[in-house]
Amino acid sequence: MKLTLSWLRDHLDTTALLTEIADALTDLGLEVEDIHDPAARLHAFTLAQVTHAEQHPDADRLRVCRVMTDEGEKQIVCGAPNARAGITVVLAKPGDYVPGIDTTLGVGKIRGVESHGMMASERELELSDEHNGIIELPSGEVGQRFTDWLAANAPEKIDPMIHIKITPNRPDALGVRGIARDLAARGLGTLKPLEIAPVEGGFDSPIGVTIAPDAAERAPHFTGRLIRGVTNGPSPDWLQSRLRAIGLRPISTLVDITNLFTFDLNRPLHVFDAARVHGDLTVRGAAAGESLLALDGKTYDLRAGDLVIADANGPESLAGIMGGEASGVTGATTDVFLESAYWQPIGIAATGRALKINSDARYRFERGVDPAFTRDGLERATRMILDLCGGEASRVVEAGAAPDTSRAYRLDPARTQSLVGMDIPEAQQRATLEALGFVMDGDMAQVPSWRPDVQGEADLIEEIARIASLSRLQGKPLPRPRAGVPLPVLTPLQRREGAARRMAAALGYNECVTYSFIDEASAALFGGGSDAVRIENPISSEMSHLRPDLLPGLLAAAARNQARGFADLALFELGPVFSGGEPGEQTVQLTGLLVGASAPRDAFGSRRPVDVYDAKADAEAILSTIGAPARAQVDRKLDGWWHPGRAGNIALGPNRLATFGEVHPRVLKAMDVKGPAFAFTVHVANVPLPKVKTPTRPALNLSDLQAVERDFAFVVDAGVEALTIVNAAQGADKALIESVRVFDQFAGDKAEAQMGAGKKSVAITARLQPRDKTLTDKDIEAVAAKIVDKVAKATGGTLRS
């Protein structure tokens, strides 16, 4: 955002110096990136008078001039065609730096004639592009500083330009008035009133406006009017100078007025040549195959649904982004239709990004302009057009209505002081909000329509702190810890998160940090995308919702890596996910993703594709690290983004500790990931903390007696899970059975041919560890019988013969 000091003073009655304004802006959060002060580079130049000029003896286009300066008469060789006796000029002496030619002058000889300095043109002093001759001043004293003469006679020539970096959450600061409002609230002046004098139309507009049903949500409000009999010549010097100062090229009065409003009041407008509009204007979605030759000279092929303003012949403008050349105004325009509308930000951002169009209008509409200023902006622009171009205005035509953005939040002065850490009196807090445009009703603050970023009590406090200046905060040392055993710095949950992160890295995963914001389509794939987690002022449409899961970010990272030739991936992320916008609807997860092979190619053939068991083993390893009990069960109550037959939950009763398995192929296709892909999610906070804190671990109690292992093979239904068999066998004798593990499975057509349709064989090893006495064969057989009985009752299976 660029503006000049004089432009700022059109809205702010202030005597503050440029440096004071720049410092205040940065302190307010409106970072000043650069200040271009022409006077700083012109300070050395003085006025002089040419007393005599004659032809150079050895050059047709050069003249030898005698110039009266504050140091006496000097000889200067000049090539300007207007160098002559009697004119007052701007003198650059030897030793002066001339910015336009990037040169420090010295005494030199030009074609054998000595020259002491130069008489400058406007381009050489970077005042304009004029270089056909040296500067001729109508008045001035010899020796007077050129900057003093400019300040008195042409102040716009040395008007400082301020370049400010505006953050996405402050669309109101994309207009000079919004910046002036912040400075006034800080106390650097008084905000001047903005006069809105409605123009009474003298006739009905022959061009009507409508909003098609398919565009109503994206285009809630459209206003316009016809102005006939205008003269569209060059704009006044003050307007041209203002636009040039911020890097814009003056075009014509009508176009320059719309550009002025864009930067002055953050109100983009558009003007149509009424003679080139056929019928009424309709805001609608583009049809497939339509195109538009825009004002930048490029033809854009529109997507179906892109928001356009169309007449009977087709699209005439890309709504909120850029007008069309066919209906653009020219020097011959006499009747103009002026448009002022409010467009929904996300739709503008999506269209602009898809068509790769950047414009000042798009930049503002996609961040959010003031919806309540749509009609007032039209009236104020109409008044300026009538003043500068003449003509007669019609009555306003209007479709839709400005969206209701009214909202109010309670101001708690005590909470403000608590959060900010500064003593800010209640009266000052209220005065600050009122200066920023908030309306106070008791302790409720009504948010102004131009501040879409204010969405809660915390934002009120932020505004108060910003205006009061956080630079006033006094540093306070932290209290010294008391003697003795120090208290833990991290909470139990934070320590658990750290342990989970370290274990994931130890398992070979690479940590990713992805955005917490994702697009609506990706959020919907993972059970999100509701209005409760929609971002009010997203940076882009690809960051419109809070993420419901960590998998979207990891899958997007996998897709980017695959596109760059990295096929074998092991990625993980630990971070928050959001199921809603209320307290308690934010949880912490650790999610890992495996794609490709388990290892690089080697001479031993150890490389194999990753599978669901890798994901399960890694999930169990992390759960074990953070203290999950070993008695967890596996169930199949899965979310829709998991493969229904190749995934499961690790749960403790109804409490889900982790999910592992293959990601659904439908999700992989939508995320452009080459599968299969396997993943796990550990719900870190769901793992119960130990009920009793023990300062030390119990001593390891090893038995001196010989352990015994026995193998069992059970014939069970194909749908029986191995964990069911393991848990049943484990419970046969908890005192003696130390562990049970699966070592073989026989399933498929061959298994069914031997054991019957729908059957499979699962083989387990049970390890028996006596504590009191050596086991006899009778003892072992008794335990084996219990194992067979328990498994039979749990699964309906039989011991395989």
Model-predicted regions and their roles:
Residues 1-203, 337, 356, 360, ...:
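Phosphate-backbone binding interfaces of nucleic-acid-interacting proteins
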Residues 2, 20, 27, 435-437, ...:
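A carboxyl-terminal module marker
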Residues 2-8, 158-167, 220-228, 360-367, ...:
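Short, hydrophobic beta-strand segments
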Residues 5, 23, 28, 63, ...:
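Glycine/proline-enriched, intrinsically flexible loops and inter-domain linkers
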Residues 47-75, 240-241, 258-326:
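Conserved mixed alpha/beta core segments that line enzyme active sites in large multi-domain catalysts
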Residues 111-126, 130-136, 143, 149, ...:
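Mobile "lid/hinge" segments at catalytic clefts and subdomain interfaces of large enzymes
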Residues 178, 409-572, 767-769, 774-775, ...:
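Extended, well-folded interaction surfaces typified by the phenylalanyl-tRNA synthetase beta subunit core
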Residues 183, 187-214, 389-416, 423, ...:
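Terminal amphipathic helices with adjacent charged low-complexity linkers/tails
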